[in-house]
Amino acid sequence: MKYASYLLFISFLLLKLPAAVCQQTYYLKNSGEYVKKKEQADFIRVVQKRVKNQVLYPISDFYLSGNKKSVGWSYMKVPPVYEGQYVSFFETGATKQVMKYAGGKIVDTVQSYFPNGKLYKSLLYTQVGDSTNIYVITVNDSTGKSLVANGNGQAIFYDDAFKYISEQGRISNGEYEGEWNGVFKTSGSLRFKEFYVGGKMLKGESVDEQGNVFHYTNPEVPPSYEGGINNFYRHVASGIRYPPAAAAQRIQGKVHVKFLVLADGKIGGVHVINDVHPALADEAMRILKSSKNWIPGRQKGRIVEMTYIIPISFSLGY
């Protein structure tokens, strides 16, 4: 299967919530949005000071209960650009996933586990340009029984919380093959059927709770700007105003703005996800909010609201 990157431009650390100095604490929603108060957050992120001669920041995420959620290393504090081993945990403390990053992208083998500690699946990630090829190597059931071995077998996949079967079908040489059936529960429930040859989807059909039928050949189509992304940047260039406070201090930089493209093409939930001067952040959000011509994304053929990230650069030209 191939998953294109939608971002344009684009060892364990601490086992208990630390109380040490030389660290920064952030509050985040599951969407990745940074919020000001713990009461607004879904989890807590602690970024430790870099060790001498170390280029990476140790980053630990915690559930609101204080139990560890994930640990990893990053080149940047906000947003993280992970490098090397990254481990996530269930709130019980059991290991959920073990993976490796290179330059912020998942590479090599990802091992996922059931809440009971049994190996769930192993996936192999390979980078081809801006796309990622993902091969299914191993799939087991919760008792440890093998369903897929060496890239061949009948796979059963679950939702992230292991509450229901999300999809099932045949794996051949690490890729989806033949008919796949499943349930998609983002923005309402959809039942779907898809047909694959050599990992490439030929066609898909989904049905929502009201009986509406959707046909598609791409399971996920990201949002886009009317006329293309260059048209969006022309809109930015014609309307952006360099903040005087930032210009006076000769502050430049790139602002990464995350937002939702709603089902009607409007945008919402606009927020900045990297550490920049507040004046640059405010202006980037203002110009983005003034853009009106967004085309919503689709999942399983149905129009849905979808998250998007876009960079806006500020340069004084000297």
Language-model segment annotations:
Residues 1-27, 236:
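Bacterial Sec-dependent N-terminal signal peptides
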